[in-house]
Amino acid sequence: FTCFGCSAKGNAISFVMMLYNMTFPEAVEYLAKKLNIEYKAEELTPEQKEARFRRSRIFEINQVALEYFRESYKQSLPAQKYATKERGFKEETIDNMLIGFAPYKGEFREYATQKGYKDQLLLDADLVRRSERDGSLYDTFRGRLMFTIRDRTGNIVGFSGRLMDKENPKKLPKYINTGDTAVCKKGEHLFAYFESARQAAAVRTMNLVEGNPD
């Protein structure tokens, strides 16, 4: 395949890797199953096994984070008011788009460690960051309405947190997004593509807007 718009090119395997955010072995296995081809996977190298395991663990902890953000939203009247009153979201939209809330106190790290997840995994998923000042760990998302970012197959690859406060004396960034991880690379994922692709294909129209709430 060749895309004359962005100059991307390759074969069927590299196309699936790009389209579905898969590693090479995952793409080969996917195509074999799709085409009913008998496929005997070669033994993965230690590096490939480690990469696959790391990706699966990040997907897993992202799902845990989603459940935490969703439950936190249900417990936060300010977040609900912001989403439904100020932004005008319907409850159906909030559920379909997996919108949540990250509490101001930043308690996700504690929540995750109580469930047995290690700090290194939280760092790998960019759900926790390390302070450049003193090396301490802190939640990446705090006091923000959370938008879930999924890949083309529906896997949760990251999050985008939108500041809710109208006044911003600390000059905090309006958005904080998941940085580069083993499953999420900047520029490779479009928010709401997974939720919109089928409908857009049916009506042959897709509207592109600037911000997640739009």
PLM features: residue spans?
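Non-catalytic accessory segments of DNA primases and related replication-initiation nucleases
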Residues: F1-D124
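Phosphate-handling DNA/RNA-contact segment within nucleic-acid enzymes
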Residues: E47-A65, K105-D214
